[in-house]
Amino acid sequence: MLCAIPHFGISQTKKTGIRFFSGGWKEVLIEAKRENKAIFFDAYASWCGPCKAMDSLVYTDPKAAAYFNKRYICFRIDMEKGEGPDLAKKYPSIDGYPSLLFFGSDGHLIKTILGSRTVAVLIAEAKYALLN
C-alpha cells in the first residue's frame, strides 16, 4: 500500500545559493517559529526582468547564501499563481516586483523593499531588519 505524504522543505537555487522553502506560506510561518528564524519573502512575477536578475545573480551568490541560510527561512512565490494573489491582498506593501519582505519569526512584517538589490545591499537590508 502506498501512502502519499506531503513534502515540505527547502529547495536550493543552484548548489551554492539561498535555500528557499518549498511549502506554502502557512508552513513557512510554522517553520520560522520552530527554528526561531526571521523570514525573507521574495514576491516575484514570472515576466519580471529584475526578478530574474535577482534569481541568477543574487540568490546564487555564496555570500548571500551563507548569510540568509543561517539566519532566515527564505520563501519566494510567483504572486500571480497559486496562493500569490491572496498573499498580495494580505500584504498591500507588495505593489511591484520584486517586493522583498522581512518578517520576524512570529510572522510580523518588519520591512518591505521594492526593487532588485545587489548582494551587498540585500545583506545590509537583511541585517537591518534583524535589528528591528
Question: What are these model-predicted stretches?
Answer:
Residues 1-13:
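Bacterial Sec-dependent N-terminal signal peptides
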